[in-house]
């Protein structure tokens, strides 16, 4: 009987962890026009958003974005200004590997990001090493979904997971300048 309870507990844990780590849903305000990364992220735009941790911590930011497309690689420079005064620059290099499929790198991404078209939205999944006070860092998984709104702005919602558990989320709107 003890073996039964161990197996049942392990199964319950696995199902709970899977539920916590699910990818973000398609934003409800999304249009029916497909988001196409190499079209919709090219040029200058501004993003306004917020990171929310399950602990209640919130961190708002604005980012100036500049994207270029050379026929194979989308380069997206992101200049962040956080509400606490911190500034940061990150640069995505997303290389098209097939129709609607990309692999990508960024300074803080561990390994390669995977991007893919999923109906009218674009999904991007990647691991990031976040700095910690002890200097060792903490690896978390981001799962982004990008969708166009009817007005042409881009909605980007992301879940942040750690060992399969959802620990935060990011929501932002990207507007053309």
What are these regions (language model features)?
Residues 16-19:
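C-terminal motif of bacterial Sec signal peptides marking the signal peptidase cleavage site
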Residues 21-23:
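Bacterial signal peptide processing site
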Residues 1-9:
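Bacterial N-terminal signal peptides that target proteins for export
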Residues 41-49, 156:
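A short, Trp-centered hydrophobic/proline-enriched beta-strand micro-motif
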Residues 143-177:
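Glycine-rich, aromatic-bearing surface loops/beta-hairpins
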Residues 31, 48-133, 145:
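Central antiparallel beta-sheet cores of small beta-barrel/beta-sandwich binding domains
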Residues 28-44:
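N-terminal helix-cap/turn-to-beta initiation motif at the start of protein domains
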């Amino acid at each position: 009987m003890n073996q039964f309870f161990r197996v049942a507990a392990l199964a319950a844990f696995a199902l709970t962890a899977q539920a916590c780590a699910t990818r973000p849903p398609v934003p409800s305000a999304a249009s029916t026009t497909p988001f196409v990364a190499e079209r919709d992220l090219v040029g200058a735009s501004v993003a306004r958003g917020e990171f929310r941790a399950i602990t209640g911590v919130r961190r708002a930011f604005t980012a100036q974005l500049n994207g270029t497309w050379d026929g194979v690689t989308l380069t997206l420079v992101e200049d962040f200004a956080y509400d606490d005064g911190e500034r940061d620059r990150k640069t995505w290099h997303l290389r098209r590997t097939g129709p609607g499929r990309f692999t990508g790198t960024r300074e803080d991404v561990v390994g390669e990001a995977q991007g893919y078209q999923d109906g009218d939205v674009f999904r991007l999944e990647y691991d990031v090493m976040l700095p910690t006070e002890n200097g060792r860092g903490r690896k978390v998984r981001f799962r982004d979904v990008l969708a166009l709104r009817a007005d042409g702005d881009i909605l980007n919602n992301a879940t942040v997971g750690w060992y399969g558990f959802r620990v935060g989320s990011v929501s932002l709107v990207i507007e053309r300048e």
